[in-house]
Amino acid sequence: MINEIKKDTQDRMEKSLEALKGHIAKIRTGRAQPSLLDAIQVDYYGSATPLRQLANVVAEDARTLAVTVFDRSLIQAVEKAILTSDLGLNPSSAGTTIRVPLPPLTEERRRDLIKIVKGEGEQGKVAIRNVRRDANDKIKALLKDKEISENDQRKAEEEIQKITDSYIKKVDEVLAEKEKELMDF
């Protein structure tokens, strides 16, 4: 019973960490990363389709992404989708390839992005702590129903806390890495 709670807790904390990584990956650094365009949806015959399904995105150099569209007729639609995204990018097409130069980030913009990253990190930590609270509530319910002893409860809560601490540490590592990435360029 307790092992199931621990496994569920770990799975939910892992999902919270992955969600945080996904949110943070969308925050633009000065370096060209293909994942930057992952959230872009292109109008493909009347339906919104992810850019990744319609084109190949690669980092041409440190400041330029190259988007190779599979269907030539979609070049303008892809270019428009990139232009109208909230990323502030200005694509230019040459044949079947669209080049997306990334403007350098100002010091002020970097600081704003770091604040956003820290806010996302705090939300990630709150999500992890909520998972811990749910697990501890389940353990207390087992104690109340006399399915486990007080010693088992204390031991289980300590193990849940260790799992929580390890995931909070992982969140801090992800945040530190992103901040370093933002300030290095």
UniProtKB/Swiss-Prot annotation:
GO terms for molecular function: ribosomal large subunit binding. This is Ribosome-recycling factor. The keyword Cytoplasm applies. Responsible for the release of ribosomes from messenger RNA at the termination of protein biosynthesis. May increase the efficiency of translation by recycling ribosomes from one round of translation to another. It is found in: Cytoplasm. GO terms for cellular component: cytosol. Keywords: Cytoplasm, Protein biosynthesis. One of its GO terms (biological process) is cytoplasmic translational termination. The keyword Ribosomal protein does not apply. InterPro entries: Ribosome_recyc_fac (IPR002661), Ribosome_recyc_fac_dom (IPR023584), RRF_sf (IPR036191). HAMAP family: RRF. The lineage of its organism: Bacteria, Pseudomonadati, Pseudomonadota, Gammaproteobacteria, Pasteurellales. It comes from Mannheimia succiniciproducens (strain KCTC 0769BP / MBEL55E). Belongs to the RRF family. It holds the Pfam family RRF.
